Structure formats: C-alpha cells, structure tokens
Amino acid sequence: MKRIVVDSSASLYALDGIDFASVPLKIVTDEREYLDDGTLDAVEMATALRTYKGKTSTSCPNIGDWLEAYEGADEIYAITITGTLSGSCNAAQLAAEEYQAEHPEARVFVLDSLSAGPELVLLAEHLRALIKEGRDFDDVCEEMLRYRHHTHLLFSLESLANLARNGRIKPTVAAVARMLNIRVIGKASDVGELDVLCKTRGEHGALERIVLELKGHGYTNGKVIIAHCGNPAAAERLMHMVRAVFEGAQVRVTECGGLCSYYAELGGLMVGFEDADA
C-alpha cells in the first residue's frame, strides 16, 4: 500500500484519491494543550491566545506518532515542516529508519519541505499525481526533490509575537512591528528559515506587495494556495488580485490549521505557489 503522510503544519487533514495520514503537532499553554488534528477550531484558539498572558509553545510529533502513521503501508512518502525550525523532520526520519528495520520490504521517503502551510499542500498534491501516474519509488523521490525547488511560501502577518516567543524570528523585529502597527511580509528561505522581506502599513499595501513578490519569485500562472487565519476577506481579495494580474492563475483559498494559526496569528496570510519552472 502506498501512503502519503504529512505533519499538521500543512493544515491538510484529508487528501482525496490516495491513502493519507496527518500527524498532529500540539500547541501548549500553561492551562491546556491544543491538538492540531483537524477538529481544532483554530480561529477560536488564536483568539484565546491573543490575550493569553502565560507561556505558550509548540510540540512536534515524536517517533511513535510517525510510526503509527506509517503502520500498514509498504511505500510511504512523508512531508514535514521545515527541519530548520522544528524537530518533526528528524522524528519522521528516525521513525522511517525504525520502520524499515522492522519491515525490510518497506520503503520510506521523508521530504523536508523547508517550509510550512500551503506549500506543503502543493507538495502533497504533486506527490499524489505522481503516485497515481504509476511512477516507481525512486522516480517519485527524484521528482519531488526537483519540484520542491520550484515551490515557495510568502506570508503577511499582523503580529509576530508567537514567532518571536519561540525563537523563529528576532524579538526586535516583532517589537518594531508592534510599535509601528505594521504588517510584515516574509518568505520561507531556501534553507527553511523565515526571512522578513519588508514591512508595510495597511492591509492593501501588504496585498499589493505579495503580488509583486509573486512576480519577483518567478510566478506566472501556476498554482497558488492562500491560507488565512480568520481573515477570509483579505484572502479572497488577494485571490482576485492575483487572477487579475496573472492570466490563467490557478488560485484557491483555504484556512490555516492549528499550528499555522498559532504562528500566523489572527489576520495572517500564508501563500504557497509554484514558479514558472515547476
């Protein structure tokens, strides 16, 4: 049996037409633990955390969680959040080694997305297409490594508090953004770090900048997935802007799951897209 497994940083909890599993991350506070399993009300969580004064953090899946997701399959393709900022990829890889030791006939490929959110959805959907084409294991792995070079992630955030609190960006950047009431535009870098590209005032300016960044990163008219945390109006507006600028653009809007909502926070947008060479 062939199976695709992703961690919940993808905000993807089901994938039609293929055997599929999502491995949840957790959002942890002093008072409760949120399991990002697809049933979590992510906007409600983000709203509660906005005024929460205690410590918060995230917890990645452990080896056992990944092993459970692999169980019963003999050809497994796992996609994880960037290994630069999370231990999920390492746990998935260690689980793959253990699973293959116990099941010598099985083959497991772990792909570090070097990203999060909607870029993982692009990767998972491309992977599904390859499997359904009947490609062999080695061919699928090679093509996924190639395709990963041509998918990208941009983000627009109203708040950087949780990113700074968990060491994902510098606290000084978050403090300046808060004081000046600005939105931050950033991207996932080629090594899986979160880089700030620019700061803008107002949502319209942020959306315009995203369109410019799409063009600057080689987007022409491929797939775009816009994920939002409690901000459907901005996501829909951006979708129409992209379609107006790029003829034939394949754009759709989704919602951030728990992990992405924790880091994007209320109002945040995450934009996964393919460049022209995808």
PLM feature segments, named:
Residues 2-3, 9-27, 31-32, 85-88, ...:
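Mixed-charge interfacial surface used for oligomerization/domain docking
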Residues 32-101:
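Class I S-adenosyl-L-methionine
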Residues 80, 109-110:
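A glycine-rich beta-strand to alpha-helix segment
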Residues 105-106:
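A short helix->loop->beta-strand "cap" motif at the edges of active sites that frequently abuts
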